[in-house]
C-alpha cells in the first residue's frame, strides 16, 4: 500500500464485505489476523482521495475483500491442490436461490508441513479451517421498494508451529530454511468467529440504503520463545532479537538458544501470548444519483458506531536446554507477564459527492472520526482482576477529514486527475498521545487506447505526525503502544502499463502487464524509541522498498491459460538510517519468478499447475523480529477445479 510502514495491517482499513474485519481495528490494529483470500470472490484496493468513505485509517489505503455471494441459481464448485512440503488445499462451495430464499455454504481447508526444518525434522507446519454460511431473503418490489436481508456466519481456526526465531547471518548463508532448537515449543492457536446481519433497501427512484449489524471475536495464544537467560539478574537476560543481532558478543546465549550448550534452570523463557479481541458495531449508508440538466450528481453518506477491545493475560514459562531439547523447568503464574484490557468506542460518518459534467468529474468528501480509548492495566500483582490495583490510561481523538479529487478527459482516450485528502490514524491508549495526521496529494495521467492501458501517478504524503508502534515483530518490547515519530515525508511514483497486441479476431490473447513503484521516505526530526533506537532527521523509514517492480505475461486461449510473473524488490533498510546501507541492516534486492498453467479438460473441469520461485532462490524477506527469515523456496502445486 502507498506510503505506509510495513507493520502487518496496522495502517490500512482492512474490511470484508465493507465491514471492519481486523480483530480490534481501533484499540489493537496490528493484531495477527487476515481473512483467507482463497475463499474470496474479489478484492478491492482503494487509494487516494476516495478513502474518505472508509476508516479509520485514511493514509495508506483500504482493502475490501468480497466474500462468495449467494448465487442466483443452484451453483457449486470444488477445488483441491497438493504439492511441495505436503501442502494441501481444499475448497468446496454450494448455494442456491429459490423464490425469495437463498443460501450459500462453503468450507476451506489449508495445511502444510512447511518449508522450514529443525534437527529432528519435527512439526513446523500449519492447519487452517474456514467455514462461512449465508442465508438471505429478498422481496420483489413491495410497494415500489425491494428489500434484501442476509445473515452471514463465519468460523475459522489455525493451528501452526510458527515462530519469531530467525537465523544468524552465518547460518542463513549455509541453511536458510533451518530452525533452531529454541523454537521447538513455539506454537500458535487461533479461533475466529464473525456474524453480520445486513439489510439492503432499493427504491424505484434509485435510492439505495445498506445497513449492517456486526460482531467479530478473535482468540489467539501464540506460545513462543521470547528471551534467553544465563542467570537471574536483569542484566543476565537477552531478548532473542538481541542475541541474533550480535551472536558473537552474545555467544553464550546463542549456544543455549541453538542447543549447543546445556543449561539447567530458566534458560529459555517461552511466553504464552494469550489475547482475546472483539469488535462490534452498527453502520448504515445511503446513496442516490440525480440528473441535473446535462450533468449528474451522486451523493453517498454513511454513519457507524463501533466498539472493540483487546484483553491480554500472559505469562512466561522457563525451560532448560538439555542435549538439544527443551525441558520445562518452571511454569509461570497466569497473568504475571501482562494483565491488561484496552477498549475503544468510536463514532464515524462521511459524505461523498460526485459531480460529472461532460469530460469533467469532481469528487468531494468529508469524514468525521470521534474515538475514545482506555487501557486498564490490572498489573502482575492482581491476576484475578479484583480492581484493588489498577492503572487507567485514557486517550481520545476527534477529527474532520476532507478530501477532493478531479478527473478530466482531455480526449476519450486520455485523462488527467489529481486529488488531495487528509490522512489519519487513531492513537493508542497512551496519555496525551497525538493521532497520526498527514496531508496527501496525488496527480496522474491515464491513457487507454485499444489494447493498451498506461497510468502514471505521483504521490506525496506529508506527515505532520507519524506514529510508530512498539511491536516485538519490529524489534521493540512488544507493548504495542504507539509513539510519536513527528514530521515525516513519503513521496514517490507509481506506473502501470498493460497491453494486448493481438488482433481482436484472434482466438489467442497475449496480455502483458508491467508495474513499477518508486518510494522515497524521510523523517524530519530527531527522537528515540525502544523499537527504532536513536533516529535522526533525514533518516529513511525502515521496511519500505525504494524500488519495486512486477511483471506479468499471460497467454490465453479457449482451453489453456499460461501466466509467467516476475517481481523485483530493491535493497531495503531494516532500521532507520541514511546514506549507504550497512549489511546487517539491509534486506538485499531479489528477483523471483513464478508461473501458472490452467487447462480446461471438460466443461466445468480445469486442471491447474502452479510454480512459486522457479529459480529456487534463497532470499531474505525480513531481519525482524529476531534474525534473518527466508522467503518461499521453489514449490510446485497441482490441482483441479470443478464447477457445477
Please state what every model-predicted region is.
Residues 208-226, 409, 415-419, 435-502, ...:
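Membrane-embedded beta-barrel scaffold of Gram-negative outer-membrane proteins
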Residues 19-47:
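Short acidic/polar hinge/loop motifs at secondary-structure boundaries
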Residues 464, 502, 509-512, 567-577, ...:
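C-terminal beta-signal and adjacent terminal beta-strands/loops
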Residues 1-23:
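Extracytoplasmic beta-strand/coil segments of soluble accessory domains associated
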Residues 75, 82-111, 119-163, 187-203, ...:
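Transmembrane beta-barrel wall of Gram-negative outer-membrane proteins
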Residues 292-293, 356-359, 460, 481-577, ...:
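Gram-negative outer-membrane beta-barrel transporters
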Residues 142-150, 189-380:
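Face-selective signature of the C-terminal outer-membrane beta-barrel domain
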Residues 277, 294-308, 333, 337-463, ...:
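Structural signature of Gram-negative outer-membrane beta-barrels, strongest in the C-terminal barrel
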Amino acid at each position: 500500500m502507498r506510503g505506509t510502514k510495513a507493520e502487518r495491517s496496522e495502517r490500512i482499513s482492512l474490511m470484508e464485505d465493507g465491514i471492519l474485519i481486523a480483530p480490534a481495528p481501533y484499540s489493537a490494529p496490528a493484531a495477527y489476523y487476515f481473512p483467507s483470500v482463497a475463499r474470496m470472490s474479489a478484492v478491492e484496493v482503494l487509494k487516494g482521495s476516495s478513502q474518505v468513505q472508509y476508516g479509520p485509517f485514511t493514509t495508506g489505503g483500504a482493502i475490501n475483500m468480497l466474500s462468495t455471494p449467494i448465487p442466483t441459481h443452484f451453483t457449486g464448485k470444488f477445488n483441491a491442490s497438493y504439492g511441495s512440503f505436503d501442502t494441501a488445499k481444499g475448497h468446496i462451495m454450494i448455494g442456491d436461490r429459490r423464490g425469495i430464499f437463498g443460501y450459500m455454504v462453503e468450507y476451506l481447508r489449508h495445511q502444510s508441513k512447511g518449508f522450514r526444518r529443525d534437527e529432528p525434522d519435527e512439526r513446523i507446519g500449519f492447519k487452517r479451517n474456514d467455514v462461512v454460511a449465508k442465508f438471505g431473503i429478498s422481496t420483489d418490489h413491495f410497494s415500489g421498494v425491494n428489500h434484501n436481508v442476509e445473515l452471514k456466519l463465519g468460523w475459522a481456526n489455525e493451528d501452526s508451529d510458527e515462530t519469531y526465531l530467525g537465523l544468524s547471518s552465518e547460518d542463513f548463508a549455509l541453511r536458510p530454511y533451518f530452525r533452531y532448537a529454541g523454537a521447538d515449543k513455539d506454537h500458535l492457536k487461533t479461533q475466529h468467529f464473525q456474524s453480520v446481519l445486513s439489510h439492503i433497501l432499493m427504491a424505484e427512484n434509485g435510492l439505495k440504503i445498506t445497513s449492517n449489524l456486526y460482531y467479530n471475536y478473535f482468540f489467539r495464544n501464540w506460545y513462543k520463545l521470547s528471551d534467553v537467560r544465563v542467570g537471574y539478574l536483569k542484566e543476565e537476560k537477552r531478548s532473542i532479537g538481541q542475541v541474533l543481532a550480535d551472536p558473537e558478543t552474545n555467544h553464550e546465549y546463542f549456544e543455549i538458544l541453538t542447543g549447543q550448550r546445556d543449561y539447567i534452570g530458566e534458560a529459555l523463557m517461552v511466553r504464552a501470548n494469550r489475547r482475546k479481541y472483539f469488535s462490534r458495531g452498527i453502520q448504515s449508508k445511503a446513496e442516490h444519483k440525480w440528473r441535473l440538466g446535462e450533468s449528474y450528481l451522486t451523493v453517498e453518506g454513511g454513519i457507524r458506531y463501533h466498539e472493540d477491545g483487546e484483553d491480554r493475560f500472559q505469562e512466561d514459562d522457563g525451560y532448560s536446554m538439555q542435549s538439544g531439547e527443551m525441558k520445562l523447568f518452571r511454569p509461570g503464574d497466569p497473568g504475571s507477564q501482562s494483565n491488561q484490557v484496552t477498549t475503544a468506542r468510536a463514532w464515524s460518518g462521511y459524505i461523498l459527492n460526485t459531480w460529472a459534467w461532460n469530460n469533467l468529474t469532481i469528487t468531494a468528501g468529508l469524514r468525521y472520526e470521534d474515538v475514545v480509548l482506555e487501557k486498564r492495566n490490572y498489573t502482575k500483582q492482581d491476576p484475578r482482576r479484583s480492581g484493588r490495583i489498577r492503572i487507567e490510561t485514557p486517550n481520545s481523538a476527534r477529527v474532520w477529514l476532507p478530501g477532493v479529487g478531479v478527473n478530466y478527459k482531455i480526449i476519450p482516450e486520455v485523462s488527467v486527475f489529481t486529488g488531495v485528502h487528509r490522512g489519519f490514524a487513531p492513537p493508542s491508549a497512551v496519555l496525551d498521545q497525538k493521532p497520526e495526521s498527514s496531508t496527501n496529494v496525488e496527480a496522474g495521467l491515464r491513457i487507454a487506447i485499444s489494447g493498451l492501458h498506461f497510468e502514471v501517478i505521483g504521490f506525496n504524503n506529508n506527515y505532520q505526525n507519524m506514529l510508530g508502534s512498539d511491536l516485538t515483530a519490529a524489534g521493540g518490547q512488544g507493548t504495542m503502544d504507539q509513539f510519536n515519530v513527528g514530521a515525516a515525508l513519503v513521496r514517490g511514483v507509481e506506473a502501470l502499463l498493460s497491453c494486448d497486441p493481438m488482433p481482436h479476431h484472434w482466438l489467442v490473447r497475449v496480455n502483458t502487464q508491467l508495474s513499477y513503484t518508486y518510494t522515497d521516505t524521510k523523517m524530519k526530526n530527531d527522537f528515540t524509541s525502544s523499537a527504532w533506537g536513536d533516529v535522526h532527521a533525514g533518516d529513511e523509514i525502515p521496511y519500505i522498498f525504494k524500488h519495486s517492480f512486477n511483471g506479468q505475461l499471460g497467454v490465453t486461449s479457449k482451453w489453456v491459460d499460461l501466466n509467467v510473473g516476475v517481481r523485483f524488490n530493491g535493497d531495503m533498510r531494516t532500521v532507520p538510517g541514511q546514506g549507504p546501507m550497512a549489511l546487517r541492516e539491509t534486506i538485499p534486492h531479489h528477483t523471483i519468478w513464478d508461473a501458472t498453467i490452467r487447462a480446461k479438460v471438460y466443461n466445468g473441469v480445469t486442471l491447474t499447475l502452479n510454480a512459486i520461485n522457479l529459480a529456487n532462490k534463497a532470499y531474505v524477506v525480513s531481519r525482524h523480529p529476531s534474525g534473518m527469515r527466508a522467503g518461499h523456496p521453489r514449490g510446485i502445486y497441482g490441482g483441479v477445479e470443478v464447477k457445477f
